[in-house]
A protein has these predicted regions:
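Basic, helix-initiating cap at the start of DNA-binding domains
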Residues: 1-31, 48
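Amphipathic alpha-helical segments enriched in hydrophobic/aromatic and basic residues
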Residues: 16, 24-25, 46, 50-57, ...
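Hydrophobic alpha-helical connector segments
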Residues: 52, 62-88, 100-104, 113-114, ...
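Helical hydrophobic small-molecule/effector-binding pocket
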Residues: 71-96, 106-107, 118, 131, ...
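Short linear capping/connector segments at secondary-structure termini
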Residues: 93-102, 183-186
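C-terminal peripheral helix-coil segments that are non-catalytic and often amphipathic
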Residues: 114, 118-125, 151-189
Length: 189
């Protein structure tokens, strides 16, 4: 039973990466090698499955953040989160839509917020960001990335996201680097 759940989440991660979060869930069940009934027994709706995929991504971000250099933690996290957004267009928008209606989403969102708060506090402590920059400002960057992904040609989306990040980080950081760090997070599965 637990094994089916893990297979479904891994399949959803892969299918969302290939086709976006709005893909028919039949494709997820097929990729996982389970029937629709099994998928819906574990995940009663799309939002519950999206929440599980999001939790895997936040788990991976937390582990990755523990290995990042403290002096550039915020920049690395922003780049990684944007790369995750580009990796599965629509997933973060779906997570926001599920907030408050899907069990577990609020807790995963809280963990993601804590991760950003810690990174931002460290950046403020080191004088790496402009005074007054808040977690809401950083979240606005991710909303802009979602906007870029929604309108950009998929073939150019990653390059456009990198450019958007460069522009916005130059606005947030006190002494922005000449180049952004490269994404390095590898998701399980």
């Amino acid at each position: 039973m637990v094994r089916n759940r893990a297979r479904i989440v891994a399949a959803a991660e892969a299918v969302f990466r290939e086709h976006g979060a709005a893909v028919p869930l039949d494709r997820v069940a097929e990729r996982a090698g389970v029937g629709r009934g099994t998928l819906y027994r574990h995940f009663p709706d799309r939002a519950a499955l999206i929440a599980a995929v999001y939790a895997v991504r936040v788990d991976a971000l937390e582990a990755y953040a523990a290995e990042l250099p403290a002096d550039r933690l915020l920049e690395h996290l922003v780049v990684e989160i944007a790369a995750l957004q580009a990796d599965a267009p629509g997933l973060f928008t779906a997570v926001r839509a599920a907030h408050g209606t899907t069990p577990g989403v609020a807790e995963v969102e809280r963990r993601a917020t804590v991760l950003l708060e810690v990174a931002l506090a460290e950046a403020h402590r080191r004088g790496r960001v402009r005074e007054g920059v808040t977690v809401d400002d950083v979240r606005l960057v991710f909303a802009m990335v979602e906007g870029v992904l929604a309108v950009e040609d998929p073939a150019r989306a990653r390059a456009s996201v990198r450019r958007a990040l460069s522009v916005t980080l130059h606005g947030l950081l006190a002494d922005p680097p000449d180049d952004l760090p490269e994404p390095g997070l590898v998701l399980p599965g």
